[in-house]
């Protein structure tokens, strides 16, 4: 390897070599390099909302042995960070990620400042092989055996003859998202496996944390494992119609298991002014002391909740139930949208002993799709773009 090969141009090749390190006080996944051919377990790339990586390593570049790396990854998520690397966050960093399902490289160093999106959409839930190779001052990238990218003249002469150290972050960033050349949502609901980095295979230790959805057959969707939740401010989502007043939402339920809260409208101090609970493959609508409604669920049909000044309606396909709420209760519900702490909650409520888990194909509010990335807060274990493929998988998933 010539000394003209810049640090930044090697960032695609170097990842997760030992020893383990910590980032922002958290203990990150421990990895062990080996030389054998046995496959290591797939790694889940998401560490929840935000930009926190799942692992951070500091690498001595004098220890690299081969200018070649490869890995396989799969995702249904169209956007997020696969990995980031730097020698310093100000003027020498690199990012490989996805945007609109396509690979994207962002690079900032003294010799090259660029953003390149390329190749086919890879967020199809299938495993894709990525290979990376340095040749002189050029970087070549293959996907599934086809060369998709060659970057030239992205290196320069180093200030000294020794390689500096480098930080590598998997599934996240070590600089503010706003410092990217073209900001994106860092969290990526995806997995990586069969990775070889400069001649080393990296294996998780037996004490490594949960592997997310990497050992489950997937389908597109939004999955709430048992005990997880998300909250949206009512002021940040599409607003009710005003003349006459009405509000509607629609949930595309694919899978449900267990019992517990599905959805609630309320505040911080009273989270369930109106709620939908899952119970034995049925949904129960309740509002305070008013009589409850029970509707048997039919998977595949959208579940609709509509409120107006006269009634609350729950429907699915041809089935419709009307909640016999009082005029004063309906008037109180309407005040939620002017309450500074008005919330739409999905999943388990605080203090709720919920065993429910469920998969949504879509969530629509006032005819507009609601993005989980817009949540005020959410559990880190929510799968933002994938669900178990079979109902048999749901009850066996633990986070």
From Swiss-Prot:
Keywords, A to Z, come to: Disulfide bond, Glycoprotein, Lipid-binding, Repeat, Secreted, Signal, Steroid-binding
Is the Glycoprotein keyword given for this protein?
yes
Q: State which residues carry a glycan (glycosylated).
A: 160, 270, 353, 377, 393
CDD domains, sorted: LamG
In terms of PROSITE patterns, this protein maps to:
LAM_G_DOMAIN
Assembly with partners or alone: Homodimer.
Q: Name one GO cellular component term.
A: extracellular region
Q: Start and end of every Laminin G-like domain? A: 43-214, 221-387
**Region forming the signal peptide:** 1-29
Subcellular locations according to the entry: Secreted
Disulfide bond listed as a keyword: yes
PTM note says: Differentially glycosylated in liver (SHBG) and testis (ABP).
Q: Which InterPro entries match?
A: ConA-like_dom_sf, GAS-SHBG-PROS, Laminin_G
Q: Name one GO molecular function term.
A: steroid binding
Report the function annotation for this chain: Functions as an androgen transport protein, but may also be involved in receptor mediated processes. Each dimer binds one molecule of steroid. Specific for 5-alpha-dihydrotestosterone, testosterone, and 17-beta-estradiol. Regulates the plasma metabolic clearance rate of steroid hormones by controlling their plasma concentration.
Q: Which SMART domains match?
A: LamG (SM00282)
- What organism does this protein naturally occur in? Phodopus sungorus (Striped hairy-footed hamster)
Name of the protein in question: Sex hormone-binding globulin
Q: Which Cys residues form disulphide pairs?
A: 191-214, 359-387
């Amino acid at each position: 390897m010539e000394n003209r090969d810049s640090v930044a141009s090697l960032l695609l090749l170097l990842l997760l070599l030992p020893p383990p390190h910590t980032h922002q006080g958290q203990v990150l996944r421990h990895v062990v390099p080996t030389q054998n051919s046995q496959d290591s377990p797939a790694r889940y790339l998401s560490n929840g909302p935000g930009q926190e990586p799942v692992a951070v390593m500091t690498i001595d570049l004098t220890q690299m042995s081969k200018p070649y790396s490869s890995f396989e990854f799969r995702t249904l998520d169209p956007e997020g960070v696969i990995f980031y690397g730097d020698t310093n966050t100000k003027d020498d960093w690199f990012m490989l990620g996805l945007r609109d399902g396509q690979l994207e490289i962002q690079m900032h160093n003294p010799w090259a400042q660029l953003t390149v999106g390329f190749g086919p959409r890879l967020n199809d839930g299938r495993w894709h092989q990525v290979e990376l190779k340095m040749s002189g001052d050029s970087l070549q990238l293959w996907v599934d055996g086809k060369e998709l990218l060659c970057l030239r003249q992205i290196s320069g002469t180093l200030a000294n003859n020794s390689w500096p150290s480098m930080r590598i972050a998997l599934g996240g960033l070590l600089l503010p998202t706003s410092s990217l050349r073209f900001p994106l949502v860092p969290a990526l609901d995806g997995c990586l496996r069969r990775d070889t980095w400069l001649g080393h295979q990296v294996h998780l230790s037996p004490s490594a944390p949960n592997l997310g959805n990497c050992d489950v057959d997937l389908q597109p969707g939004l999955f709430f494992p048992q005990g997880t939740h998300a909250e949206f401010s009512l002021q940040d989502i599409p607003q009710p119609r005003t003349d006459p007043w009405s509000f509607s939402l629609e949930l595309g339920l694919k899978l449900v298991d267990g019992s517990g809260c599905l959805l609630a409208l309320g505040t911080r101090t009273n989270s369930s002014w109106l709620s939908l609970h899952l119970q034995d493959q049925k949904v129960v609508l309740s509002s305070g002391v008013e009589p409850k409604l029970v509707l048997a669920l039919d998977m595949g049909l959208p579940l609709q909740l509509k409120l107006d000044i006269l009634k609350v309606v729950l429907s699915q396909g041809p089935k419709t139930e009307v909640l016999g709420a009082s005029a004063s209760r309906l008037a109180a519900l309407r005040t939620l949208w002017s309450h500074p702490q008005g919330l739409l909650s999905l999943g388990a409520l605080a203090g709720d002993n919920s065993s429910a888990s469920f998969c949504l194909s879509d969530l629509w509010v006032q005819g507009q799709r609601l993005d989980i990335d817009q949540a005020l807060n959410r559990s880190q274990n929510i799968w933002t773009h994938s669900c178990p493929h079979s109902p048999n998988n749901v009850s066996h998933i633990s986070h």
